[in-house]
């Protein structure tokens, strides 16, 4: 067991809550102690929803453990069914309740209800939130469609031609507490409609049990978020022959690949690549003169598997950045992230420890960080611009405006969100350079979000004394003055290289001349 003040994912029952809260006519009875009801806040505070999640907690207390907690479970299940009248009931237990082994799912199935009951057995001590969401969606899909499985009749992706209608697809994976899922769905539906393709069902977001039963009315499935939907897509392919897409339409190239993959599976004519590229401003903006100085900028990426892999491809192939770090907390997608990292000649970081991520960030010395809410905090401490690309996120990353990550408009949003911090960083450096002018004063608040620059900390963000790990290094006044002229987003790297050079040459004091010599040495 590990004690930490931050975690990238909650326990698996939070993933189950995400699926239940995303859907209609479903209720989730969770066998849990009083303290586990905190999860409600994730939906009302971060997602800013106007209603509570459809979850009933048994909320047992310490004094209940001496009695029959199974009766408490049955009482809560009965009351939830009578009050909410769901079409499908999910039953599970939290990490604490798992230790009691009351088997709430088995109890619910023995109560004689005339509705589908999904027994969620989510191992809380070995799995986490995204796996819990994936397993819940998979079990729900399987429960509602298992009676319709036919081993003789498989769904053909060309069936729409025989029926004389437009092709239909399902969009699977978007859920509450996902990163910009609501807007991604709108954007992808718009793109598909432009290609003459209708959307049959979007699930789990906004779907009902009746919609899940209609999944087999479509020709293929769009696996929009692999962490949530891949297991369900595999089951549908195995039992109904339904093909599904593998390309995630984040970025211009991926969106074009996605459209062509859908066309190939449905036997539609392929589209013109140049014509599609003009639908977003990102290609032109990234080629414009104003963006030339962005080429080769060092970027560190960490997030869920879907967004981290897509971000790496956009950074390298569409914006001309140099990816110096890539990682994920999603162990289920570790293989894909490692493969992407290998293509970029970097070592993948697979961890759920934010301190390891921050340490890797320091060593990589990036000029831009793309990550989660925690990487934003770490980047502030290190004085590096950051843009959030993945959950877990803060309420400020759930905008009221239309702000997708996928498709053409998503590419526009990404360009703004990634490039503007770098532009602001350049402006920040100019302010730092000319702060001796009367228009500027020390202590001026930075618009990057971190606190004003403290001249005592300008050389080091995390050390009080200026020491190298091998021996003490003394910076002279001239050396300090010259180092402050270096843009803050590369200052850490310049300082490290200069100290390495000083140790290599046996120089006890670093002056401005030493800094110049070090620059020439490492050039």
UniProtKB/Swiss-Prot annotation:
Residues given in the record as [4Fe-4S] cluster binding sites: 36
Protein EC: 1.3.7.7
A single BP term in Gene Ontology: light-independent chlorophyll biosynthetic process
Active site residues per record: 290 (proton donor)
Keyword ATP-binding: yes
Broadest EC class assigned to this enzyme: oxidoreductase
A molecular function (GO) term: ATP binding
InterPro entries assigned: ChlB/BchB/BchZ, LI-POR_suB-like_C, Nase/OxRdtase_comp1, P-CP_red_C, Protochl_reductB, Protochlorophyllide_Rdtase
Keywords for the protein's UniProt record, in alphabetical order: 4Fe-4S, ATP-binding, Chlorophyll biosynthesis, Iron, Iron-sulfur, Metal-binding, Nucleotide-binding, Oxidoreductase, Photosynthesis
Required cofactor(s): [4Fe-4S] cluster
Pathway assigned to this chain's UniProt record: Porphyrin-containing compound metabolism; chlorophyll biosynthesis (light-independent)
Binding site for substrate: 425-426
Reaction catalyzed: chlorophyllide a + oxidized 2[4Fe-4S]-[ferredoxin] + 2 ADP + 2 phosphate = protochlorophyllide a + reduced 2[4Fe-4S]-[ferredoxin] + 2 ATP + 2 H2O
Cofactor detail note: Binds 1 [4Fe-4S] cluster per heterodimer. The cluster is bound at the heterodimer interface by residues from both subunits.
A Pfam match: PCP_red
Biological role stated in the UniProt entry: Component of the dark-operative protochlorophyllide reductase (DPOR) that uses Mg-ATP and reduced ferredoxin to reduce ring D of protochlorophyllide (Pchlide) to form chlorophyllide a (Chlide). This reaction is light-independent. The NB-protein (ChlN-ChlB) is the catalytic component of the complex.
HAMAP family, per database record: ChlB_BchB
PANTHER family: LIGHT-INDEPENDENT PROTOCHLOROPHYLLIDE REDUCTASE SUBUNIT B (PTHR33712:SF7)
Entry's family note: Belongs to the ChlB/BchB/BchZ family.
Self-association state and partner proteins as the record states: Protochlorophyllide reductase is composed of three subunits; ChlL, ChlN and ChlB. Forms a heterotetramer of two ChlB and two ChlN subunits.
Name this protein carries in UniProt: Light-independent protochlorophyllide reductase subunit B
Species assigned in the record: Prochlorococcus marinus (strain MIT 9301)
Gene name per UniProt: chlB
